[in-house]
């Protein structure tokens, strides 16, 4: 089995090399894997950092957008270049630990499972600084609400619909037309996978939450409203 690890990047000059290094350190696994980096029109030195990493990881696939198009578009571009049996998304910051990827793959062995999500929301987030508490609690509660809406609308219980760590079969996208350009990619692909009959299995993962001072780009209120509308829209339409 081969897994395509897609890494969308937008202005992550401080972390992208570390993330790619951690992915490389996955080493030999029970599955083969490829790493596909999609630079989404970064305006900082992310491209230079990616080039440095490619010197250390010759098989690294790099695709670039001339202009910023959004995370959803970056992931869709990565999927077009993927050759694996399964696809998993890895954010370019240090919030998600690549060491959890083998655990996601292992979970495919559970009977009837074809899609695996890594859930952060079976517990309160790991908060490091007092001033972050209101922000992360808002984000946590917003995600729980959206996950509850997903569960009600699509008939399968999920605790973390918005998680970055989504492992799904590439062939499952053959009959799915993805349209999202931004962060609404998360609810769109979840909605469409569930409507096609996929069973999503969740496993707990550890994360290191970051704030806007660390480069976080998600707007909890704006993107939360868009996610809610996306879930409702695809419940009604294909």
Where are these regions (language model features)?
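Acidic donor-diphosphate engagement hotspot in glycosyltransferases and nucleotidyltransferases
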Residues: 19, 46, 75, 99-101, ...
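Short, acidic, metal-binding catalytic loop of nucleotide-sugar glycosyltransferases
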Residues: 21-32
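Short beta-strand-to-loop acidic/aromatic patch adjacent to the donor-nucleotide binding site
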Residues: 85-93
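Acceptor/aglycone-binding surface of glycosyltransferases and processive sugar-polymer synthases
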Residues: 65-81, 86, 99-183, 209-218
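A conserved acidic beta->alpha catalytic loop
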Residues: 39-48, 94
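Conserved donor nucleotide-binding strand/loop of the catalytic core
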Residues: 33-36, 47-81
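Active-site beta-to-alpha loop of glycosyltransferases that engages the nucleotide-sugar donor
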Residues: 7-21, 41
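Hydrophobic helical membrane-anchoring modules
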Residues: 1-3, 129, 153-156, 178-238
């Amino acid at each position: 089995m081969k897994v395509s690890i897609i890494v969308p990047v937008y202005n992550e000059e401080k972390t992208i090399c570390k993330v790619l290094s951690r992915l490389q350190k996955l080493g030999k696994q029970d599955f083969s894997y490829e790493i596909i980096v999609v630079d989404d029109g970064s305006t900082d030195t992310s491209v230079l950092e990616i080039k440095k990493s490619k010197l250390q990881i010759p098989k690294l696939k790099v695709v670039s957008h001339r202009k910023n198009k959004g995370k959803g578009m970056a992931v869709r571009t990565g999927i077009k270049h993927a050759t694996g049996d399964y696809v998993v998304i890895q954010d370019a910051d240090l919030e998600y630990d690549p060491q959890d990827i083998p655990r996601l793959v292992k979970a495919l062995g559970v009977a009837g499972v074809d899609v695996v999500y890594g859930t952060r929301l079976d517990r309160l987030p790991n908060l490091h600084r007092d001033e972050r508490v209101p922000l992360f609690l808002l984000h946590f509660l917003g995600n729980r609400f959206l996950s509850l809406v997903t569960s009600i609308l699509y008939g399968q219980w999920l605790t973390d619909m918005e998680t970055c760590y989504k492992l799904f079969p590439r062939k499952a996208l053959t009959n799915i037309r993805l349209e999202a350009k931004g962060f609404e990619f998360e609810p769109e692909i979840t909605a469409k996978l569930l409507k096609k009959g996929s069973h999503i299995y969740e496993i707990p993962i550890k994360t290191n939450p970051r704030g806007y001072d660390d480069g976080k780009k998600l707007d909890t209120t704006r993107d939360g409203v868009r996610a809610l509308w996306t879930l409702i829209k695809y419940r009604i339409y294909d």
